[in-house]
Amino acid sequence: MTMMKNMLLILWTLSVSTLVGQDREQVAEETVTTNHSVVIKGKSVPFQATTGTQPVWDESGKAVAAVHYTYYLRTDVKNRAGRPLVISFNGGPGSGSVWMHLAYTGPKILKIDDEGFPIQPYGVKDNPNSILDEADIVFVNPVNTGYSRIIDEEVDRKMFFGVTADIKYLAEWINTFVTRVNRWESPKYLIGESYGTTRVSGLALELQNAQWMYINGVILVSPTGLGIDRNGPVGAATRLPYFAAAAWYHNQLSETLQNRDLEEMLAEVEGYAINELMPVLAKGGFVGKEERSAAAKKMAEYSGISEKVILQHNLDISPSFFWKELLREEGFTVGRLDSRYKGIDRMDGGSRPDFNSELTSWLHSFTPAVNFYYRNVLNYKTDIKYNMFGPVRPWDRNGDNSGEDLRQAMAQNPYLHTMIQSGYYDGATQYFDAKYTMWQIDPSGKLKDRLSFKGYRSGHMMYLRNEDLISANDHIRDFIKMSLPKPGEPAKY
């Protein structure tokens, strides 16, 4: 009898261990659906949330990865064909979709203060500014981010982790998703943040060329350079307006400049950077002494960095040095992704901060929120870890022609519009650099009526500041409405 009990105990233990092991391995396909409602702009919006996985197949049709997504569908809409679908990606590469999902466009947002700083208790609340009133949304986690995983360990990782590979498999995945949820008739939009802008710019063309899917709009939130070269004088000049914005925020400029409106001042700095500073920098070591000194003096006036230090750096202050130098005398660094944030280093000396002060703050608040939200609100229960940043390296960065891809997609599709959203205090993907990217996308000037830029008084994730959360979502609504063709309007030049 004792032996039988021991055998049963062993079998029970093995069965439990097996179940736990299964829970730690992502499955190719599963979904959980729940029903909710949220008040947006004062009106109740009923919606269905479906979260789960959809496979990525190799060329033989074998499932090799599971991509996790969350799809929000407004349920009181009769004309589904006319209802826009927004497909959302974050960046990294390697970042989950949590950032825009739980802080920007989704129906729930994390609990933070009005400037975006963490507060306790952690959790989520209704988002009265979500775009779900105007469009359905799917948030996608590329392979190895969020709950997405490789499920065939023998698969070549190069299938997923590179500029071109990423775009290729995700285009195929989007085709399958749109087919499964029956949204081919719907106007479709891509939104990407940071590296996600490289992704969606490439997807705009890949979807057209390989999946025969034409979209209505691309929204670039804090865009990368999209493969457009800006080394040398261009990069050194275009970062000055960001320096001015960060210095203005921290009261490091002259009283005259501090008393001016930020955007008014930035327009002046932009003009100087393009029209005067860039030609000086183009002369390199052959610039005259007086011209060099005058440029250093003007840069110091706009950046809050001393003229002496600027001259020591040959008029080329790197962003990482700026983050360390701006508040050095006060004993602080400033954040890379959002320079409103301050950090404290081990020592005030050095040429770059010890850590990104804004990122630790964001992880502080986002990680508890996303784990709580999936398990307790969406009823998605798993022992798999949500990868805020997943293992996707080495990442093949060769072949990044995403800016040109976007231009080609827009040229081939008269319906396609693009909007850029940037925060003035973003030191990683600087706002004036984003403007420069927009200018370079279309050298012909024939697409500029379909290209637009919006700036915000915050950083990389401008939506963390409540005032910008409201306006940025309104700008997306307006963009969607503007870019929808009138009934019967043909796609032609």
Language model: regions and residue ranges:
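Catalytic histidine-centered segment of alpha/beta-hydrolase-like enzymes
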Residues: 457-468
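A catalytic-pocket lid/entrance helix-loop region that shapes and gates access to the active site
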Residues: 107-111, 204, 208-301
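Alpha/beta-hydrolase fold nucleophile elbow
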Residues: 183-195
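N-terminal cap/lid subdomain of alpha/beta-hydrolase-fold enzymes
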Residues: 61-161, 439
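Short alpha-helix in the alpha/beta-hydrolase fold that links the catalytic acid
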Residues: 416, 430-440
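Alpha/beta-hydrolase fold catalytic core
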Residues: 284-429
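Glycine-rich nucleophile elbow surrounding the catalytic serine of serine-hydrolase chemistry
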Residues: 192-205
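Conserved acidic catalytic loop of the alpha/beta-hydrolase fold
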Residues: 168-186
